[in-house]
């Protein structure tokens, strides 16, 4: 996929880049797979802000994605490749031979007219979903389950892929995009291939307005807030932090502070930390 550049007719256009969307084949989504998506503006059910800097943005509809890929031994033909405003990867509309329609995450190289399948007997080709025990070692995969039948949870972003490194006993060893090596139960499913829209990470937004359309609001520095809003706030004019080190809005150390639980149940499945050299 290519990235489009613009002539510098304005300061924003000078840096802005945008996907060419050349893989997209349909502008209209499948209505039966759409549901209303209410804007939460970063609030939880109590109305408290749980994600800062969210709000506004263009109204979207949620596309129901088949992360489970559990319709076995029934071939499906790819009807369209579509843009999904709720994720970075593209999605594909698959129409099964019995008439059912489902959206799946579109791997790179998947084209309209291709036939995909799920199940233990599916071929090893992009878009097919199989249990890890039926996938050869060394295969590149995405949309990986952590619990059997729960649906893919790992490696779902644009351009993402993991590699199946080994299979031993009840577990498969995976190398994730972060560099982490971890065990996953061998009966969990994964989809073959690398996800589409690999150049998403080099797209330059270019101007604040584009971010506002995406539902992101400005990030304000703590030092320009009042002391009741942030530990760095207050003082006359430009003031120092006033503490031994910078802290978060909730008073936790902002630099070098581990935020992951020190005793998490899943630690035993991680062979190599993503930060390890």
From Swiss-Prot:
Per UniProt, the keywords (alphabetical) are: Ribonucleoprotein, Ribosomal protein, RNA-binding, rRNA-binding
Q: Output the superkingdom of the source species.
A: Bacteria
Q: Name one Pfam family in it.
A: Ribosomal_L2_C
The Gene Ontology CC terms held by the record are: large ribosomal subunit
GO MF annotations in UniProt: rRNA binding; structural constituent of ribosome; transferase activity
GO process annotations (BP): cytoplasmic translation
Looking up InterPro entries in the UniProt record yields: NA-bd_OB-fold, Rib_uL2_dom2, Ribosomal_uL2, Ribosomal_uL2_bac/org-type, Ribosomal_uL2_C, Ribosomal_uL2_CS, Ribosomal_uL2_dom3, Ribosomal_uL2_RNA-bd_dom
Region (Disordered) residue ranges read 222-259
Checking HAMAP family in the record gives: Ribosomal_uL2_B
What NCBIfam families does the record tag this protein with? rplB_bact (TIGR01171)
Instruction: Spell out the family assignment given in the record's similarity comment.
Output: Belongs to the universal ribosomal protein uL2 family.
Q: Main role? A: One of the primary rRNA binding proteins. Required for association of the 30S and 50S subunits to form the 70S ribosome, for tRNA binding and peptide bond formation. It has been suggested to have peptidyltransferase activity; this is somewhat controversial. Makes several contacts with the 16S rRNA in the 70S ribosome.
Tell me how this protein assembles: Part of the 50S ribosomal subunit. Forms a bridge to the 30S subunit in the 70S ribosome.
Kindly provide the name given to this protein in its UniProt entry. Large ribosomal subunit protein uL2
Tell me what organism the protein belongs to.
Clostridium beijerinckii (strain ATCC 51743 / NCIMB 8052)
**Designated gene of the protein:** rplB
